[in-house]
Amino acid sequence: FSDYADISTPGGTITYDSGVTEDVWGDFTIGDYKIYKVGNRIMGEIKLPNMNMANNYIMINPFKINEKYTPITTVSVNGIALREDNTSKSICGYYTSDQKVRLICSKGQKLHAVGIYFEYELKNIVQ
């Protein structure tokens, strides 16, 4: 895939539980990831437990986002993702009150604030 994500194509809208609606730009699928731009953020989603995290974490790294995004600075290991084969992997990031975990994307298992994050539903994550 390209080194640059094409986020210039309108991809619809996303509506949050709060009722707020934002435009979605782009729609790129990489493995189990869906990547898109919402507002001024690059976001993605993946359905647990269908995740091979060791591979997918690395795959997102080549995206170069030439805009300034608000970084996420709180990082800690605070959960475990269960895979279909019953193996598990530590989750880094932090939980929010809306029952999603926001993860900071980086290469490999070590995550840090690069201003790009993903939201995962918590139903398949155990602390």
Residue ranges and their predicted role:
Residues 30-37:
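Short amphipathic beta-strand and strand-loop transition segments with alternating hydrophobic
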